[in-house]
Amino acid sequence: MWVEGLSAGGQSLVPNPSPKQALGSEMHHELQTLADPGAVARAGAAFVADRARAAVAANGSFHFAVSGGHTPWAMFAELASETVPWDATVIYQVDERVAPPDDPDRNLTHLTKALGSAPAQVRPMPVNESDLVAAAASYAALLPEHFDLVHLGLGPDGHTASLVPGDPVLSVTDRLVALTQPYQGRVRMTLTYPALARARQILWLVTGEDKQEPLAKLLAGDTTIPAGRVEAAASLVMADRAAA
């Protein structure tokens, strides 16, 4: 695994998104219901591997953004049994807590462990820079024009990425990466709605009874929850029976 460093002094090489890109209630979600969290992890891994092979065959690389939470790490464990072109894979973070390196709260800590020796390029969010606003702008400069795949989770409160109810970051339309207010004790760096709209495909992994209500709202296109405002070219929801 190659973890790429980042200087906070970079400038975005891509145009700022327009507000029109940021919000959307017409998103159609395909739902796949599976037996349990293990089945969700296995199906998610197979889907990621298939998308990776297709992207590399078509364009020579696979640009994949990964959220935190519990579901992605089980999926990554299942990826060990899949054929993935890791040497042509670039992994980005959807969100990250502002915490010291190797802190167990860091999504990067879990991502690094999950990848093991897989030779993917990892572009971590620079949450240890002294100027986090400049660091967020620098990370935005690294983002591709399109993500081949973005993984998202769904919180019981309807949040996704670190786009949480009531946070001012929900209204950001002119930046691809932004900082949140403290949530569960941590400030977060997160991709914004315009950044998520760059996804050619979104994969939602949703498990547990406490996700029933937010999942129903997501599938209904309910924009009163943050997850319901995500817009992308295509969306697949893999949920276990407890959530669905």
Locate predicted features:
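C-terminal functional extensions of proteins
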Residues: 198-244
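Ligand-binding beta-strand-loop-alpha-helix segment within the catalytic cores
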Residues: 28, 86-151
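Glycine-rich N-terminal segment of FAD-binding domains in flavoprotein oxidoreductases
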Residues: 57-80
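Glycine-rich beta-strand-to-loop/alpha-helix junction loops that act as flexible
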Residues: 66-71, 152-156, 207
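Class I SAM-dependent methyltransferase SAM-binding "motif I" and its flanking Rossmann-like core
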Residues: 149-194
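A glycine- and small-aliphatic-rich helix-loop capping segment at beta-alpha/alpha-beta transitions
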Residues: 78-86, 109-112, 165-173
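N-terminal glycine-/serine-/threonine-rich phosphate-binding loop
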Residues: 26-64
